[in-house]
């Protein structure tokens, strides 16, 4: 089967024949130009690489083709992608359903030009910079890897992406939300943006704006405190809330961090109490979130404060705590209903039924649909750029793969997906739910009290 690359190769060979005919065996001088390391190295469909007089034999993993190289998958071999999620420790509730959703999407999507797709052994980002970087180095060392689904946590992505990007790979995250990884939504790249990074999760600038509008306009509260744990996700989201709340006219009385691993939250809560806030927004994880709700009643001045968590706490273990009754939570829309991924034909309802049949329980966190859509986005892009050889092998150009992901446009379980220039591809709708009864531990069953779908103010 001939594809775009086959046609370009024929064109290059034709030009080469003409050059040889014109020059004979003369020793004309040729020059090459080194790429500017800071320049955009994405190959466009109409460009070709400079020809040299050295030919490298092709192997199963030969790097060739565009500026970022390519992967050749031998006939009968599997296409290798990787899952990089938090699958152990306190945040495994987030990464495990993401990885399962990736595996299910691969099964539903099927073969690509006769080749199966595999994630190999799932890698663990540990929800930490150290875990993200170590796993990224493992991925980058394997020249057979085509792309990555992950990470679970923004902090892991910040450390992983320089390695992933330098290796010419693409990574699509289902649950990273830190604005630093993409952009400020006004055309300026985030401080940790790297080429080749994409996500189907929302940008937390939207979530911060949503919570600020809910607290100020719907609840009618004008003072609030914000608590983070110092990582890019929690600090970024708490900061986005602070900025948006103050722009609306509210006052953030305290902006403070806890340390991961802390069990005594009394000192931090006592500091918060000095500002007499009407609400506290704490977009952190367990177990620190557990200790806050369990200890806050004992802090004078905070007995009646309104508590608001975020998607990191929208998990059954946390929702089952009696102290969470009366809380609000912000996070991505979970009202997927019969939304169907057009690339596989699987609806959100069908997926959940299949997930429970496979795992014996519902997904434990909010980003399962984002993981499914992210995986199909990657698989579809691979299918669009893969070139099939006469021997049944596939060649996948990494620069073209990034281009294909960037150009993605399809209906997924989370809604319509399309990527901006910095890799924000997913639905930006944020919902706030109310948790009145700790016997209800399925986040999808919590009543939606506020919906937000765009920046305001």
Residue ranges of each PLM-predicted region?
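Segments of small-molecule ligand-sensing domains
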Residues: 355-368, 379-442
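Extracellular/periplasmic periplasmic-binding protein-like sensory domains
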Residues: 293-372, 385-386, 442, 446-455
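Extracytoplasmic ligand/sensor domains, especially the bilobed periplasmic-binding protein
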Residues: 145-256, 306-332
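Solvent-exposed, acidic/polar segments of extracytosolic/periplasmic ligand-binding ectodomains
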Residues: 45, 60-68, 79, 325, ...
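Beta-alpha junction/loop-to-helix N-cap segments that form part of ligand/metal-binding clefts
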Residues: 24, 66-68, 93-101, 108-187, ...
């Amino acid at each position: 089967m001939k594809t775009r690359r086959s046609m370009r190769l024929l064109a290059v060979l034709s030009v080469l024949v003409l050059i040889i005919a014109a020059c004979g065996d003369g020793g004309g001088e040729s020059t090459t130009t080194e790429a500017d390391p800071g320049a955009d190295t994405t190959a466009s469909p109409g460009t070709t690489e400079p020809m040299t007089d050295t030919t490298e034999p092709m192997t199963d993993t030969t790097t060739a083709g565009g500026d970022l190289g390519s992967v050749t998958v031998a006939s009968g071999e599997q296409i290798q992608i990787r899952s990089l999620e938090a699958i152990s420790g306190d945040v495994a509730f987030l990464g495990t359903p993401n990885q399962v959703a990736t595996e299910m999407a691969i099964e539903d999507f099927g073969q690509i030009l006769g080749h199966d797709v595999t994630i190999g052994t799932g890698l663990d980002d540990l929800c930490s910079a150290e875990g993200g970087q170590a796993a990224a180095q493992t991925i980058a060392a394997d020249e057979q890897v085509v792309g990555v689904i992950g990470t679970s946590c923004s902090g892991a992505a910040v450390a992983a992406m320089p390695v992933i990007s330098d290796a010419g790979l693409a990574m699509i995250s289902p649950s990273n939300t830190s604005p630093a990884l993409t952009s400020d939504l006004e055309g300026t790249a985030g401080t940790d943006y790297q080429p080749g990074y994409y996500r189907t999760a929302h940008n937390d600038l939207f979530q911060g704006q949503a919570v600020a509008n809910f607290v100020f306009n719907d609840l009618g509260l004008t003072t609030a405190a914000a608590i983070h744990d110092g990582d890019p996700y929690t600090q970024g989201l708490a900061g986005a809330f602070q900025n948006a709340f103050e722009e609306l006219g509210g006052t953030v009385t305290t902006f403070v961090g806890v340390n991961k691993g802390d069990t005594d939250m009394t000192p931090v809560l006592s500091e918060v109490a000095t500002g007499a806030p009407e609400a506290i927004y704490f977009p952190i994880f367990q177990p620190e979130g557990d200790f806050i709700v369990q200890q806050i009643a004992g802090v004078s001045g905070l007995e009646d404060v309104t508590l608001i968590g975020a998607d990191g706490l929208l998990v059954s273990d946390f929702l089952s705590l009696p102290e969470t009754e009366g809380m609000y939570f912000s996070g991505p829309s979970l009202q997927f209903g019969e939304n169907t991924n057009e690339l596989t034909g699987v609806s959100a309802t069908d997926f959940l039924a299949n997930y429970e049949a496979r795992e014996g329980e519902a997904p434990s966190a909010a980003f399962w649909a984002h993981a499914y859509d992210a995986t199909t986005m990657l698989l579809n892009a691979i299918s669009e750029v893969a070139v099939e050889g006469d021997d049944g092998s596939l060649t996948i150009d990494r620069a073209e793969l990034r281009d294909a992901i960037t150009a993605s446009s399809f209906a997924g379980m989370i809604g319509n997906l399309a990527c901006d220039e910095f890799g924000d591809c997913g639905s930006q709708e944020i919902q706030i739910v109310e948790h009145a009864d700790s016997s209800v531990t399925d986040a999808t069953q919590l009543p939606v009290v506020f919906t937000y779908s765009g920046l305001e103010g």
